[in-house]
Amino acid sequence: MAIKVIVELQAKPGKRAELKSLIESIVAKEGAGQRGFLGSTRYEVLDSPDMLVEIADWESAEARAAHMQEAAATGVYAPLSEMLAAPFRVTIIRQLA
């Protein structure tokens, strides 16, 4: 069953544009080739200038879990930590049946 992954990222002060650019670069380089990845969109948070939210669509929780295992092994997301003011928050949701 398809899922959505909501990722909330708090950039260091004044670094949201750089964080957005880095995420877009990673998605462009890694996203299209990931099995089960259907795409993602990034959003700004109107009352929090350093917050960025990404909503990603996956074919299944299993496809995302496989991707995250591979990402942990390769360190593809490691550069993000340098730009974050706090650990990112992930919420995984699926449509009610």
Predicted regions and their residues:
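Weak global preference for isoleucine
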Residues: 3-6, 23-26, 55, 92-93
